[in-house]
């Protein structure tokens, strides 16, 4: 079933989970390479914030905000859900939304990724003090989810769900960059959870599992 078109890029933090979800639900979704604040005039007219990802359905339906897109994809393809990804009742649905909102709005936030992520990728000049201060702030924010997953294999129930697909894929922004070997030892439960979900979500289809020994900043 052709569902529509995603506008983003393949390795975008908030897009990988959508591509894998579409695959798991046998939904055909095209991907048009698009970058934030560099939308075409026509696309910018539809989505003036120019934030990724955005989606336009085959029927012209326009949708932004990643959690809304996850929900829409699942509703369209849940008859093909062979993995038990979705909720079985209202309680599970609420719990899945809770975890997705937590990682999206409380952990992967501008306050927690700027300016270190731009410096790490070489998009802006490296400055030691703001890099270290912002990276430390981000790592501190991960101490809470580290404790929350201490006694959990999965976030909701005893199976891999939408919450794990979403949560695990968003964690990559930290684990492939500022979480070095020393920091992984300080976040043992989150590290174990991330590696497990990386493989369960088949994220190696999109990029390798990267667990750096040390933090290496790209040269601009």
From Swiss-Prot:
Q: What is this protein called?
A: Putative glutathione S-transferase C1183.02
Domain GST C-terminal: from-to ranges:
89-216
Coiled-coil boundaries:
none
For this protein, the record's PANTHER family field holds: ELONGATION FACTOR 1-GAMMA (PTHR43986:SF1)
- Function statement: Involved in the oxidative stress response and detoxification.
Instruction: Supply the alphabetized keyword list.
Output: Cytoplasm, Transferase
> Which species is this UniProt entry from?
Schizosaccharomyces pombe (strain 972 / ATCC 24843) (Fission yeast)
The EC number of this protein is 2.5.1.18
The enzyme class is transferase
All copies of the GST N-terminal domain together span 2-81
Q: State the family it belongs to.
A: Belongs to the GST superfamily.
- GO terms for biological process? cytoplasmic translational elongation
């Amino acid at each position: 079933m052709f569902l529509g078109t995603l506008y983003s890029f393949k390795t975008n933090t908030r897009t990988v989970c959508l591509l894998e979800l579409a695959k798991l639900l046998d939904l055909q979704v095209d991907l048009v390479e698009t970058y934030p604040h560099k939308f075409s005039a026509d696309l910018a007219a539809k989505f003036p914030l120019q934030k990724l990802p955005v989606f336009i359905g085959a029927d012209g339906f326009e949708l932004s905000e990643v959690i809304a897109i996850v929900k829409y994809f699942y509703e369209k393809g849940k008859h093909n859900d062979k993995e038990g990804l979705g909720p079985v009742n209202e309680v599970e649905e609420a719990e899945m939304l809770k975890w997705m909102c937590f990682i999206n709005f409380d952990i992967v936030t501008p306050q927690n990724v700027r300016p270190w992520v731009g410096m790490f990728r070489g998009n802006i000049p490296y400055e030691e003090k703001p890099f270290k201060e912002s990276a430390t702030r981000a790592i501190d924010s991960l101490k809470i989810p580290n404790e929350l997953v201490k006694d959990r294999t999965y976030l909701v129930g005893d199976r891999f769900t939408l919450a794990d697909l979403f949560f695990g894929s968003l964690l990559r922004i930290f684990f492939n960059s500022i979480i070095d070997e020393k920091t992984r030892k300080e976040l043992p439960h989150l590290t174990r959870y991330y590696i497990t979900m990386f493989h369960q979500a088949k994220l190696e289809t999109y990029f390798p599992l990267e667990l750096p020994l040390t933090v290496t900043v790209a040269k601009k």
